[in-house]
């Protein structure tokens, strides 16, 4: 970056104009600090973003995925993972501090972070209080690439134990396609009926794919 004019260097640009003025690659370059022989740090940052599909994809990157990036040694990987984890925790904090339906995009982002990168199917529940604030996020069931077994009685037990007033269901499709199946619809209705017996509302069911998150409520499937 020394070859760049001072005003174009990410650090100087940030100090002069603020972080919002920097592109994603420039912000990432500040974290990486150095590039490789023949590859500048800005170019390395751009390659990293391209490999993972932008900042959103990078947030979902796991340690094994980061290990495949040439030029990311243990020190850089650990620093990058720390920043990514802080970003994930910020989203969790945002959900915990206010009613989740004040920010449906935050729910989507959170679920994508939790479930979008998994290669196995997981069924999870967000347990909410009467003001629809997050009490707990719990992955309750884990399955194969094609199916997972969900037991309504276990969901009811956790809802009662946590004194939840409402909940949001979520599961991922490791195939990458976030399209609800007939089995997903049947399960949702079964859980909704069972939970109504203990006066707990099902507010939504999200299906998480690699690139998108589908809401049952928005589809009219609740």
UniProtKB/Swiss-Prot annotation:
Residue window of motif JAMM motif: 171-184
GO molecular function, one term: metallopeptidase activity
A single GO BP: proteolysis
Alphabetical list of Gene3D superfamilies matching this protein: Cytidine Deaminase, domain 2
Binding residues annotated for Zn(2+), in chain numbering: 171, 173, 184
CDD domains xrefs: MPN_DUF2466
Presence of keyword Protease: yes
The keyword ATP-binding is assigned to this record: no
Limits of the MPN domain: 100-222
Domain of life of the source: Bacteria
Keywords: Hydrolase, Metal-binding, Metalloprotease, Protease, Zinc
PANTHER family reported in the protein's UniProt record: DNA REPAIR PROTEIN RADC, UPF0758 PROTEIN YEES-RELATED
Family to which the UniProt record says this protein belongs: Belongs to the UPF0758 family.
Protein's recorded name: UPF0758 protein Lcho_0695
Taxonomic path: Bacteria, Pseudomonadati, Pseudomonadota, Betaproteobacteria, Burkholderiales
